Amino acid sequence: MPTFVFADIEYTGSAAVEQRYFLQDALYPQQERANLSVYFAPQAYTSFNDGNDSISFKGFYRFDQQDEERTHGDIREFKWTHSGEEWEAQAGIGKVFWGQTESLHLVDIINQTDAVEAIDGEDKLGQPMVTFSLFKDWGNTTVFALPYFRERTFSGIDGRIRPALPVDTDNPLFESEDEEKNLDWALRWQHTLGDWEVGLSYFDGTSREPDFVVATNESSEPSLRPFYPQIQQAGIDVLALMGGWVIKFEGVQRKVMDEDYTAFVGGFEYSFVGLFDSVYDINWLMEYQYDGRENQSNVIAQNDLMLGTRLVFNDIDGTQILAGVVQDLDHSNVRSGFIEASSRINNHWKWRVDAYIFSSDEPTEASYMLRRDDYAQLSLEYYF
């Protein structure tokens, strides 16, 4: 009978206070310009069976001053991992990231977006999953079984960055008769070939990106009900190193409700090392975004160009600044801009500044609902 000896449990995590200030008055009377929130994100890890098995946990809880829907908790990760010589199996709740580009992640489809967290869609909810990975000289292959679907979070009636009608998250609609219990599955192969990194993926299941149906809620008020269709998605992501150039590309072919369309994002990042004989590095970024759903009003990245720059200070505090603008090439008066800056104060404390500006005078564009939601956010983060 095998005996399992657990190593010590490692506890880490972070907590933060965030002050967000919107630069313009809100469109709707329930909304405020200033908003304070705090979050706590504990982590734990232990290994056993001579390091061949491990259990990891990542939790998250946020309290928001204004928006009840943004006050929420989630298990980002709680999984068991068993590692063999050339294979690995996992079961539980996990987070997986696919992709290479900066401005948009098209192939990243395993986890649902925690949309109340930030406008960039980088924050994800934990996804129940069982995975099996095979590691060979010809690449790494992983099969995913996803037995339960997570619905996307949305700001409530008191929150900013939301559509004109509130989203009725209590009454979602599904194409699958199994609703959130539909068994989704995915397959991914990735490999490094010299200076090239290539990933191929396939997903079959419930779309993480909902459509919306205008309806009435329990109070007989108009609302938007999320509708989650079944989709099939084939994806490719590529990164290539060419001297000071980094070429990035992501593309998908999707079938949704008997409609096929293509979307892709691609571009480059070029690095100037030691700017003007200093310790600073500056990177220039450009990416083009295309989506074949040209008549879909809820699609933002249809025919857009992102230009940006990243300034790396190369100091002991890891200071860096990323700034950029995304221009709609179909409408000259539709664009957005962003700034992300961060630096460590000491071994435990870090500050972060995030700012977003939205400009849209086209009512038919998805970004029109954000036209008064320019904001700046200051975060003070503690790591333990």
Describe the residue ranges of each PLM region:
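Repeated loop/turn-to-beta-strand initiation elements of outer-membrane beta-barrel proteins
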Residues: 9, 49-55, 86-89, 138-141, ...
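Outer membrane beta-barrel
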Residues: 45-161, 194, 360
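Residues that define the transmembrane beta-barrel architecture of outer-membrane proteins
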Residues: 32-38, 71-76, 124-128, 135, ...
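Residue-level signature of outer-membrane beta-barrel architecture
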Residues: 9, 44-48, 81-84, 93, ...
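Membrane-embedded beta-strand positions of outer-membrane beta-barrel proteins
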Residues: 13-15, 55-59, 91, 132, ...
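Outer-membrane beta-barrel "beta-signal"
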Residues: 132, 268, 357, 370-384
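Detector for outer-membrane/organellar transmembrane beta-barrel domains
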Residues: 244-328
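Transmembrane beta-strand segments that form the barrel wall of outer-membrane beta-barrel proteins
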Residues: 15-25, 54-65, 76, 113, ...
